[in-house]
Amino acid sequence: MTSYAVNPQSIKVHVEAALGDLLISSVLRLDELTVVVDGAHYLQAAKILRDDPNCRFEQLMDLCGVDYSTYKDQPQTGLRYCVVSHLLSVSLNQRVRLKVFAPDDNLPVVQSLCDVWSSANWFEREAFDLFGIVFEGHADLRRILTDYGFVGHPFRKDFPVSGHVEMRYDAELKRVVYQPVTIEPREITPRIIREDNYGGLH
């Protein structure tokens, strides 16, 4: 059985008290606390989680985007894009997951956390690049994983697996060129081996 330096239920009580009315929901599942705040109060909530003496989440460990358009194979019922941050308190040995949903699915915008935790910089650039989530107040919001000529955001669930364009080296032009994707769309079905014990491999 896992023993915790701080009881997860105590973390929930402290975080709920610190955030107060800024909190939309707070769920403790598998001894991990997830809190959801409104986009209008995202930056304020982050500062409270960093500065409150019972929270003291000094470090942002990770930040990513999520596309909920087909979550659990169900049609979308709420907002589509979410930003999820994982925060760590080194001094109190506790963690929390902070979630905020972008209020507009057509142009997802949330506030940048770079002024609260500088480690958010490249994480936010990655979420912008892969999901198209715009971080308001980010000083250098540009692509970080795809090239600067890339069209679209490849982690969105409506982005085609094959992409839109491909690159190849053109010997005549002596440079890399873009061209429309040349592979045909296809449905990929996993191979199933029906022999007993996988053909005697086990």
UniProtKB/Swiss-Prot annotation:
Its EC number is 7.1.1.-. The keyword Transmembrane does not apply. The keyword Coiled coil does not apply. It is a peripheral membrane protein. PROSITE patterns: COMPLEX1_30K (PS00542). It catalyses: a quinone + NADH + 5 H(+)(in) = a quinol + NAD(+) + 4 H(+)(out). Pfam families: Complex1_30kDa. NDH-1 shuttles electrons from NADH, via FMN and iron-sulfur (Fe-S) centers, to quinones in the respiratory chain. The immediate electron acceptor for the enzyme in this species is believed to be ubiquinone. Couples the redox reaction to proton translocation (for every two electrons transferred, four hydrogen ions are translocated across the cytoplasmic membrane), and thus conserves the redox energy in a proton gradient. HAMAP family: NDH1_NuoC (MF_01357). NDH-1 is composed of 14 different subunits. Subunits NuoB, C, D, E, F, and G constitute the peripheral sector of the complex. This is NADH-quinone oxidoreductase subunit C. It comes from Albidiferax ferrireducens (strain ATCC BAA-621 / DSM 15236 / T118) (Rhodoferax ferrireducens). The gene is nuoC.
